[in-house]
């Protein structure tokens, strides 16, 4: 937890991976009390049992997280439960789809977006392995399908889509801290992303 706080520095938006940081409820409460930081809280499967994982996310929504993120694979009942946890709070629900092998066709991606929205997603996150430049084009084309989409590619070829997504309408993108490891292939560091944005703005 202390290492996570050091990596956060003075950033204004951060993803809290509960499965990686493993905070106590008191530690998470203290972290979310920092009103000058917007938090996306997620707990990927494989570390905690399902009830513990969902308990963390429910608590995060009620303690002031801006977003909680669940995977599409967790099913409709979990999505409904997490949507209910957000009711009456400022917290928004992200339903995410990850494909670490390839980028599906545009039609498949649009079907995935519709499925996520059908589960109550305020934000749909799509992250796919990019194996060819055309995959970047497919992912970025999704921004024409309405608001509330964060779509980008993973892997070396997909790096450019992480930057381009901001110009296409993404509310945020994901970067690695300068003094820590990334959580997905192809992530730029905070400093690298800032240099890219500043270069485009100059």
Regions found by a protein language model. Give the residues of each.
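Conserved N-terminal beta1-alpha1 strand-loop-helix module at the mouth
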Residues: 1-54, 62
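Glycine-enriched alpha-helix->loop->beta-strand junction motifs that scaffold or abut catalytic
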Residues: 10-12, 36-37, 59-67, 86-94, ...
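A short acidic, often aromatic-flanked loop/helix-cap motif at beta-alpha or helix-coil junctions
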Residues: 1, 101-103, 132-134, 157-160, ...
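Generic hydrophobic/aromatic pocket-lining and core-packing "Φ" positions
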Residues: 2-5, 28, 57, 79, ...
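Catalytic beta/alpha-barrel core
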Residues: 13-23, 42-49, 57, 65-76, ...
């Amino acid at each position: 937890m202390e290492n996570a706080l050091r990596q956060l520095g003075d950033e204004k938006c951060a993803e809290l991976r509960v499965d990686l940081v493993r905070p106590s409820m008191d530690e998470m409460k203290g972290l979310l009390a920092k009103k000058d930081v917007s938090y996306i809280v997620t707990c990927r499967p494989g570390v905690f049992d399902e009830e513990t994982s969902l308990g963390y996310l429910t608590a995060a929504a009620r303690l002031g997280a801006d977003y909680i993120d669940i995977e599409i694979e967790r099913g409709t009942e979990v999505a409904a439960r997490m949507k209910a946890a957000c009711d009456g709070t400022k917290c928004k629900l992200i339903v995410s789809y990850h494909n670490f092998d390839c980028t599906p066709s545009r039609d498949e991606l649009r079907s995935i977006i519709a499925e996520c929205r059908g589960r109550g997603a305020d934000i749909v996150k799509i992250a796919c392995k990019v194996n060819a430049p055309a995959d970047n084009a497919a992912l970025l084309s999704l921004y024409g399908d309405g608001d509330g989409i964060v779509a980008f590619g993973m892997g070396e070829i997909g790096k450019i889509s992480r930057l381009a997504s901001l110009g296409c309408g993404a509310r945020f993108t994901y970067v690695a801290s300068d003094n820590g490891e990334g959580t997905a292939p192809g992530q730029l560091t905070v400093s690298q992303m800032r240099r890219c944005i500043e270069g485009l703005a100059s």
